[in-house]
Amino acid sequence: MVTTKRYDYVPIDQVQEHPLIANHRELNESKVAHYQRDILKNGLLEPLVVWERKQREYFLVGGFHRLNAIKRIRAEHPGYYDRVDVRVVTGELEEIRALNL
């Protein structure tokens, strides 16, 4: 069963994509641009959802477009979003893969 383990504030470089749980759709450039503007204006209002496999090893489960927006913000504004809010979930790999966030 997938459960929320905790909410945390982690270094963005520790959030990675895992090939077996990449359940996102194709990257939508207009959606990423929208998130860039929104995050710069209002901050990250909804945390990324990550699966913690080992201590400080986080794999993205939900928030693919937001993560890409943050990466682009960081490229344009060094020092922004070195850390991000995340919801850390636990569960077996098959349960995590079944999520469609």
What annotation goes with each model-predicted range?
Residues V32, E94-E95:
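Alpha-helix initiation and N-capping motif
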Residues R66-L67, E92-E94:
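Short, charged/polar surface micro-motifs in flexible loops or helix N-caps
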Residues I96-L101:
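Short, Lys/Arg-enriched N-terminal segment that forms or immediately precedes the first helix
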Residues M1-R87:
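Short, charged/polar connector segments at secondary-structure boundaries
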